[in-house]
């Protein structure tokens, strides 16, 4: 995905980064069989949910105005979402 440059305030960046970490947590929680979150979903529904979240994370990361944020948890969640097969 190519970088997109946008004009955002530092507060907007902080809010989006936190939302992205929350999205990574959603992916991790849905894919964790020991976690009750998402256990009411079928495997196909789980896949759709994690891929939707991964798309949001990829979009956010592609914005070109990030500073020194650590994207390792986000990258790991995206990789896990893409690897999940029902």
List each model region and its residues:
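Beta-rich interaction/scaffold domains
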Residues: 1-86
């Amino acid at each position: 995905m190519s970088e997109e440059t946008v004009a955002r305030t530092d507060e907007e960046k902080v809010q989006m980064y936190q939302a992205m970490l929350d999205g990574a947590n959603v992916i991790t929680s849905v894919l964790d069989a020991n976690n009750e979150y998402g256990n009411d979903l079928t495997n196909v529904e789980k896949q759709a949910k994690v891929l939707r979240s991964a798309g949001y994370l990829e979009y956010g990361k592609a914005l070109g105005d990030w500073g020194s944020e650590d994207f390792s948890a986000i990258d790991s969640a995206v990789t896990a979402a893409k690897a999940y097969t029902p």
